[in-house]
Amino acid sequence: MNRKGTGFSLSVSIIMGAFLAAGTAIAKDPDPSRLLISRNAEFNKEILRVSDNVYTAVGYAVSPVSMIVGPQGIVIVDAGLDVASSREIRADFRRIVDKPVKAIIFTHGHPDHTHGASAFMDSTDVQVWAREGFPHEQHALETAGILIQKKRGKKQAGFALSPKHRINNGIAKAFWPSRKGGIFSADHKVNPTHIFNSERQKLSVAGLDLELVAATGETDDGLYIWFPAEHVVFAGDNFYKSWPNLYALRGTPYRDIRGWANVIGMIMQEDAVALVGGHTRPIIGKREVNQTLANYRDAILFLFDKTVEGINKGMTPNQLVDYVVLPEKYKNLDYLRPYYGNPEWAIRAIFSGYLGWFDGNATNLFPLSDAQEAQRIVKLAGSEDALADLIVGAINEKDYQWAAMLCDYLLVVDPKNKTVMLRKADALTALAQDKLTTTARNYYLSSAIELRKQASALASE
């Protein structure tokens, strides 16, 4: 293995478990921005040696890319966000070992794990493995003709924001698309050449024996990879160091939350000594891996079971988010902090995923339209001017959620009210600063930018 003259950071010895262990409980920090800034250390750009023959590149793009070295070549696990960053990873992998890529394995079909694949196509004989249904999420929405998730996805990711307003993305550095073709555009799309449709598929390639395991969690096409010779598991997006994204703001089909927790239990049964997640740094050491996965699984199951308990008591989604409170032992674990996903969204997703839109309150069988409700709120306030005064009062009292809601009423009855647009933008900006969940921050701030642009356009008419 040639490590001379490399321009990248390589941990030449196996990562110490104490360094990467994610099981450290930390005190609750009232300053989300400070927590996110300290989080940046998780995304330092380097190649980590996970075991004797496993290397993981972190910090190059949104998701890690791993290399398993075999006697006859290498296997790539996930291919990164884009061809440019993946080419850099390929070059740095080649400095470690100059062997041909024999296979690429996609843990699921999200673009940040697949769109860099052409950088690893050393020949036309490279096997590209994925699970049946790949990529399920995109197919389900596109088949229905639903496109709005693309616009919402840009807000969730914060692509319209400046570096000043994106500290990171919770589970990755803040990246922006390098091409105008769309979110996570691929220069050369690489499709799977091999699909497996069983619960567990044994794969012999490059002189390596691997096992691909069906693992429906974040996506229906998800899988994890078990490398028994070195007891390494590659979990894909079913694990990363954050409260999991059990519901994505861009809009997705229901993610089987109980099934997700069960997959974590399956991964635990492998008894791995190293865990490579779909984002963030690997976890090394049997004890650390088992403890982390157990807490991850148990926290998800607690939330699911408590939500079902509340549902069976007749609670509405709004009532459930007050009823379901995670125990402190989970809330204070850094790898369960809501950097990316948020427990409240998961609670609402469970309700709608099983019971649909109707919350059980007869009043809501045929609710007022937005216009009808807004007109009545204005009447209740006394006038549009009186409602505008209430908005100012709410902002002055730092009641930003209420201020934004009041703005919505007034914008329904007066959709070109520039002043209210700007006040809602201010309220959303303030809400963003108070949230740790990066996807929420991004969505708030992106929406605020839209409102300010709309107000500016109206002012110039």
Where are these regions (language model features)?
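Metallo-beta-lactamase
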Residues: K28-R34, R49, G73-V75, L81-V83, E137-A214, G259-D271, ...
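Accessory terminal helices/loops
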Residues: K28-I37, I146-K150, A160-K164, F175-P177, ...
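Conserved beta-strand hairpin/beta-sheet module of binuclear metal-dependent hydrolase folds
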Residues: N44-V97, Y224-F227, H231-D237
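Bacterial N-terminal signal peptides
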Residues: S11-A21
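Bacterial N-terminal signal peptides that target proteins for export
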Residues: M1-S13
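Divalent metal-coordination and catalytic microenvironments
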Residues: N53, I68, D78, F93, ...
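Active-site metal-binding motif and surrounding structural segment of the metallo-beta-lactamase
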Residues: E42, P71-G73, A84-A130, N197
